Swiss-Prot record:
SMART domains: Ribosomal_L14 (SM01374). The lineage of its organism: Archaea, Methanobacteriati, Methanobacteriota, Thermococci, Thermococcales. It comes from Pyrococcus furiosus (strain ATCC 43587 / DSM 3638 / JCM 8422 / Vc1). One of its GO terms (biological process) is translation. Gene3D superfamilies: Ribosomal protein L14. This is Large ribosomal subunit protein uL14. NCBIfam families: PRK08571.1 (NF006344), uL14_arch (TIGR03673). Keywords: Ribonucleoprotein, Ribosomal protein, RNA-binding, rRNA-binding. GO terms for cellular component: cytosolic large ribosomal subunit.
Length: 141
């Protein structure tokens, strides 16, 4: 017997991309904000189970620390939105998507990008969820 309110047969990955980047993961920064490499130290709006590392995926906002970049940016705690991940994820139409690297864009707590351009492609999931990122993206995949 089906569970009440189960609806159509959709997998978990059909709802949102796989969370493949745990706390501690290093990301390349794909904008011109001055940071080059960041490390995830927290995931915004992540409600996990006991003693489990918080993980993030494409389109999620994370709290990160700048590891490499301009001297005024280094060692700062910033917010970032993940725009690419190497781990393959499945879309509703059945297409599987993966990128060459794990990348993020530095944003304000409201979600406005701090840079003015984004290098490389941006996942459609991130561009739809964060409209300001989608507006400055050159390629949306």
């Amino acid at each position: 017997m089906a569970k009440k309110g189960a609806g159509a047969t959709r997998g978990v990955s059909a709802v949102r991309p796989t969370r493949a980047l745990p706390v501690g993961a290093y990301l390349t920064v794909a904008d011109n904000s001055g940071a080059k490499v960041i490390q995830i130290i927290g995931v915004v709006e992540y409600h996990g189970t006991r003693r489990r590392l918080a993980s993030a995926g494409v389109g999620d906002m994370v709290v990160a620390t700048v590891k490499k970049g301009r001297p005024d940016m280094r060692h700062q705690v910033v917010r970032a939105v993940i725009i690419r991940q190497r781990k393959e994820y499945r879309r509703l139409d059945g297409m599987r998507v993966k990128f060459e690297d794990n990348a993020a864009v530095i944003v304000t707590p409201e979600g406005v990008p701090r840079g003015t351009e984004i290098r490389g492609p941006v996942a459609r999931e991130a561009a739809e969820r964060w409209v300001r990122i989608g507006s400055i993206a050159s390629i949306i995949v």
